[in-house]
């Protein structure tokens, strides 16, 4: 099984995909493949960020109970 890439590696790969597509000098078939790859990477990155946000919004109280911390999100989540 392949080793899972880090968030930073996926982000760098997505940036490269976007750069390739912006240049516009690649064949249509490759552009479609790159676009699909970019969508998949974007989805993976969003999931990683969502999980990180869930982790960061939990605060341990003195008695050891977890409570959610309201960071004033803009309502785009769930």
Swiss-Prot record:
- Record-level GO BP terms: DNA catabolic process
Does the record's keyword annotation contain Disulfide bond? no
EC number(s) from the headed UniProt entry:
3.1.11.6
Where does this protein come from, organism-wise? Pediococcus pentosaceus (strain ATCC 25745 / CCUG 21536 / LMG 10740 / 183-1w)
Q: Which reaction does it catalyse?
A: Exonucleolytic cleavage in either 5'- to 3'- or 3'- to 5'-direction to yield nucleoside 5'-phosphates
List, alphabetically, the SUPFAM superfamilies matched.
XseB-like
The answer to whether the entry has keyword Amino-acid biosynthesis is: no
Output the Gene Ontology terms for molecular function. Answer: exodeoxyribonuclease VII activity
Coiled coil region boundaries: none
In UniProt terms, what function does this protein have?
Bidirectionally degrades single-stranded DNA into large acid-insoluble oligonucleotides, which are then degraded further into small acid-soluble oligonucleotides.
| Gene Ontology CC entries for this record | cytosol; exodeoxyribonuclease VII complex
Subunit and partners: Heterooligomer composed of large and small subunits.
Which InterPro entries does the entry mention?
A: Exonuc_VII_S (IPR003761), Exonuc_VII_ssu_sf (IPR037004)
- Gene3D superfamilies registered for this protein in UniProt: Exonuclease VII, small subunit
Q: What class of enzyme is it?
A: hydrolase
- The primary gene name is xseB
The primary site where this protein sits is cytoplasm
The alphabetized UniProt keywords are: Cytoplasm, Exonuclease, Hydrolase, Nuclease
Per the record, the similarity remark reads:
Belongs to the XseB family.
Name by which UniProt lists this protein: Exodeoxyribonuclease 7 small subunit
Q: Where in the cell is it found?
A: Cytoplasm
